[in-house]
């Protein structure tokens, strides 16, 4: 069961916040290894088409920094946003490999496809039948952002960010409209704030 220790651990972003001992282990913020776990949504078993909306609170592209605090903000943004884009790149590569396996399977006689040595590998190709649409929004900052904003939970800051997020989401949804991936496709629509963003 989840208790207050688990909540504390979820905020244990070292070195800013300490780890929390749980069951004999020191536990830290899961975002340190996977801040935006896309695999949990996109790799889940199933054959139905899927629309995934991912919100990345950190941006790859940001303003110039002039102070130590701004430099630390930028460092944190780069560390965490890079995780998201590496995960996205890996998912795209995996989808392409599966697509190629499916094409390969079509060229192999049915009797050979039943060979256990081939069957498990070729089965991976069946995971590309569904259509996958990913809408990925990165937070672009707000005018009143403070230094070390990742740790600013004041009411004015949160209100400003929530409103910016609401407007950015509305703009992104209006931009893609009814666009969806076709069967077998993995399509990504990226936005940095409210603006379309080039993706890896």
What residue spans do the PLM features occupy?
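Short helix- or helix-capping micro-motifs
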Residues: 9-10
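Conserved catalytic cysteine-centered active-site region
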Residues: 14-22
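Active-site capping/gating segments
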Residues: 6
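Non-catalytic peripheral regions of patatin-like phospholipases
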Residues: 1-3, 22-27, 31-200
């Amino acid at each position: 069961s989840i208790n207050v220790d688990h909540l504390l651990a979820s905020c244990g972003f070292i070195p800013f916040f300490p780890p929390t001992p749980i069951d004999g282990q020191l536990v830290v913020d899961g975002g340190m290894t996977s801040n935006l776990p896309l695999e949990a949504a996109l790799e889940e078993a199933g054959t139905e088409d899927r629309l995934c909306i991912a919100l990345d609170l950190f941006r790859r592209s940001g303003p110039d920094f002039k102070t130590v605090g701004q430099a630390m903000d930028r460092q944190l943004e780069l560390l965490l946003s890079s995780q998201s884009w590496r995960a996205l790149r890996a998912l795209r590569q995996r989808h392409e490999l599966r697509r190629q396996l499916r094409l390969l399977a079509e060229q192999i006689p049915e009797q050979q496809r039943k060979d256990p040595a081939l069957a498990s590998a070729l089965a991976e190709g069946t995971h590309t039948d569904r259509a996958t649409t990913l809408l990925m929004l990165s937070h672009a900052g707000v005018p009143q952002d403070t230094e070390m904003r990742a740790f600013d939970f004041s009411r004015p800051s949160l209100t400003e960010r929530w409103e910016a997020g609401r407007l950015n989401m509305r703009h992104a949804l209006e931009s893609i409209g009814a666009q969806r991936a076709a069967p077998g496709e993995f399509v990504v629509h990226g936005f940095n704030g409210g603006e379309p963003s080039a993706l890896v």
